[in-house]
């Protein structure tokens, strides 16, 4: 496996599918994760929920390994059918239809923050949304929360990958930096059979790192889109 498995978004987007493929093809007896000496908690919980024995997982940082047979997993675009299957595996199967509307705040993040969140959040709150910082939740709690969610909004970031755990037909509202617009989350939303909405935002300052800039969003545009989502939900 490649060396980006400590990136939450890439883990969900690509590595989960590779683990499932390894299981199907009988290649999951010994899985090597290069470059890191320890797996994160979400790495471990994913592996456990896929029912792969942890004894089969071997993180390593050695320069040279000698193996009898090595299978390399090709780094290719994600497969929607794999992500939908993973959602079915880990979903909480609540008898109650999804009811939450979740706004994920990046106020605890070190970068890519919403500068005018104090103006934006009251609009969400007035329409019955709840504010969440994903840093406060375990991986299992994030899955449970999203399985109960019918509408989701946030700035683009790693936590956006959690939309794969939302039930089919949910609404996804991305607040996107218009200078670095990407189709990644749109493609993911489509793959999971969600409705997708886009709200553009504007840079504040200029971070030397690509795509790390803080942003401001147009509160009137946000309110307009939220009204459309609310109409669709009701």
Model-predicted regions and their roles:
Residues 1-234:
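The feature primarily captures lumenal catalytic ectodomains
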